[in-house]
Amino acid sequence: MFPQNNLPGLLLLLLIAPTTPGAASGAAAAEPADLWRREHRLIDLHQHVGCTTQHLARAVRIMDAVGLGLVVNLSGGFVTPARDGGPSEFERNQTLADTLHPGRFLHYLSLDYSGWDDPGFSERAVQQIETGHRLGAAGLKEYKRLGLFLRDKAGNLIRPDDPKLDPVWKRCGELGLPVSIHVADPKAFWLPYNERNERWKELKDHQSWWFGDTNKFPPWKDLLESLNRVIERHPKTTFVCVHFANNAEELEWVDAALDRHPNMMADLAARIPEIGRHDPRQVERLFLKHQDRILFGTDFQVYHRLILGSSGNEPPPTDADAELFFAKHWRWLETRDRDWEHMTPIQGDWTISSIGLPPSVLRKIYFDNARKLLVRSLPPPTLRARRISQDLPLGQPVRNNLWELAEPVRIEQRAADGEVNPALTTSVRALWSERYLYLALEAPFTRLTVFEPAQANAERVALDRPGASLWDRDVVEAFIGSETGAPGRYIELEVAPTNERLDVRVDLPRKDFAWSSGFESTSLVDRKHKVWSCQMRVPLQSLAANPPRPGAVWRLNLFRCDRANRAFLAWRPTLSGSFHEPARFGWLEFLP
């Protein structure tokens, strides 16, 4: 479980935000964002974490302090076998992270270019992609080595658009693996290498980052054009162009590139200092226009020292420095503060101005866009049922009640593909006693679609008449499986706004509609506030031969059908046209 508060990060945000009209204007955005951080909903799509016990522990400690629930470690490593024949670098890294900190990290693989000049490289590279997918890699990370460092045996640079790599990009698209790709670097890295260069602090400590030698390196714009050709040739592959589309200095170029390439996205990693020096109104317009294509990322790194977007020979940052680094990201995105010192001073001696995005856009950048992008790879979610000492009557308000002790989860993603629908976000809480499992759902609506009159004495099932069964109107559903060794065996419960209900014992492909669990429910429709609430009380003896013990974990998925909006939502998307995909269930944990 995550810590129940996030006081250090919140205090930092308060400490660095001045009491100005601009700061006050960000209050509306900060309130929901603070809640998201307390609930650890944010996803950082761009970090590099050394997979050692110490580095992972430090990374998670900082994640907890600043409100990150999930980090994408782009440095997952190669999937090619180790020299001694043992597990690959990727397997070792993923196993350690999943063992020590389950559910906190996803890992991208990197391509091993060994044997580039040998026959069959493309086929072997595709095999690496397929192996990574089988092992659970969430995507492919490609570094700026393409076009700048990697060379063939003749000494020629290997460009991003080399035809030998086309099968790799294509296979990533076929497998649903996004490609996070870095080409080029800031323009200043091509300008004269001297103290007049505005990035001199960085370059003098990293001479290998200077690419101004035209005998060794291509022009800056040539690399961007090379990547553009790749994106155009592979429209079914999603390319996350890191560091704000690899061109944070030219907003018009980024805008045009996103317009031109629907399969292109951009992360923010290590480029807010550059984006933030632009006119904040221009930046805000760009973010509003492309709000579905921008992803939160920081380039935060945890190795023998912390790296806050970039670094040089300065003293190693502390954990407190890391918290301030993240707090400045929140400040830039959530307030309208002007002319303040950015989060990575080594990247330039200038100030930045905040863009104060509305909550509806912030949530997309902070986590919704990443949830859709990574929908196939995200770890299964967990609904934690709080234990109560005595049974609870149904119909009591969720607020100011035992229900408030239960941490909510949300049904808000389209079951088929993970698209998020915040307007219909349905919260779910769980409690359990010695005899019952309790579920409470709260569902906003625009217009209810129900069978009238309600059928009180019999379940509404008409398999021979399409459109005449309970699930053909508005319902909420819970699929609960107590047998971890029998994934196709579970109980299906449905409740409509009219409080019509249905229970089914499922043993795929069979469904027993005559079976009865004896579960009870209440349904309350608040037409003034457009919310309908449902509570269920399910006898545990109907769900399992033996009652759960504290700490037990069952399988669970939750769904909602909203016919007026043609919305078929899931807690964990099934990625198919059916809700009955037990491989896509999450978890129900019975807390002590």
Model-derived features: positions:
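Structural preference for beta-rich elements and adjacent junctions enriched in aromatics
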Residues: 379-592
